[in-house]
Regions:
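N-terminal secretory targeting modules
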Residues: 1-57, 71, 227-234
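Charged helix-capping and loop-helix junction motifs
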Residues: 123-133, 164-172
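A short helix->loop->beta-strand "cap" motif at the edges of active sites that frequently abuts
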Residues: 141-145
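Second-shell loop/turn segments in exported
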Residues: 82-86, 115-123, 161-162, 204-208
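Oxyanion-hole/transition-state-stabilizing segment in secreted/luminal serine hydrolases
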Residues: 66-79, 90-128, 136, 147, ...
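Conserved beta-strand elements of the Class I
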Residues: 57-61, 81
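Short, basic/glycine-rich phosphate-binding loops at helix/coil junctions
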Residues: 18-26, 74-80, 108-112, 198-199
């Protein structure tokens, strides 16, 4: 645990990494997939790959927003696996989707893409990667209920990153359309976190990640999907 915490503390978090810090001989495509170069990503992926696969109820799949939260405690009435990796991208998720599929989860809650945007990945490329993720889940795990979550707003005054909430909303609309295409449920939490067009400062310390109150809002939204489906199954 101490080693993992140290790696997390010292990781080259994609949310804070400038692609120009990569070696000069690296290609642009490698720069935009810098998540592969972090020891934290490699360590977490190897840990997940080492687990004996068993049928599971719920998997949360994503980046630091997922990774940082104690989903098992927040959803203590449900069997939950946290498959978040701080700094991850849509490409990183594609690189490790096999482990998720092998677990044969009843549900997958997917939140990914903000790090792609920070890296300057074109929206069309993010959408293409996302479609590949959903293709794999639909084809190889057809009984899994997939919940595509909207990207969260950011607070540009706090982040220090040139992120644009208008672009985030554009991507969210595309994710909603993909959800409909694959007959998956789209969870739009963006409106519940936004205030005056920005991530509500009461829900964040850095303008990008959530604090405890922000996670409480998110958890409430997730629980509503459990309750809705339980009622539908009665």
């Amino acid at each position: 645990l101490a080693i993992l915490l140290a790696l997390a503390e010292n990781q080259t978090d994609f949310l804070r990494t400038n692609a120009n810090e990569m070696p000069e001989n690296d290609s642009e495509s490698k720069k935009k997939n810098i998540t592969y170069y972090t020891k934290y990503y490699q360590t977490k992926k190897s840990i997940y790959d080492s687990y004996t696969h068993k049928d599971s109820e719920t998997i949360f799949l994503g980046d630091s927003l997922t990774d940082y939260y104690e989903w098992g405690e927040a959803l203590s009435d449900h069997e939950v696996l946290n498959r978040g990796i701080a700094g991850d991208t849509t490409t990183g998720v594609l690189n490790r989707i096999d482990e998720v599929v092998k677990a044969k989860p009843d549900r997958v809650y997917l939140l990914i893409g903000i790090n792609d945007m920070i890296a300057g990945q074109p929206i069309n490329k993010i959408e293409t990667n996302y479609k590949q993720i959903l293709d794999i889940l639909k084809t190889r795990s057809p009984n899994t209920k997939v919940y595509v979550q909207s990207l969260f707003p950011v607070n540009t005054a706090l982040t220090g990153h040139p992120l644009n909430n208008a672009t985030i909303r554009d991507l969210n609309k595309r994710l909603e359309d993909l959800s409909n295409l694959y007959d998956y449920q789209y969870i739009d939490i963006y409106p519940e976190l936004v205030e005056f067009g920005q991530l509500n400062k009461d829900f964040t310390f850095d303008g990008l990640h959530l604090n405890g109150e922000g996670y409480r809002i998110w958890t409430r939204k997730i629980l509503s999907t459990y309750n809705t489906n339980e009622e539908a199954e009665k």
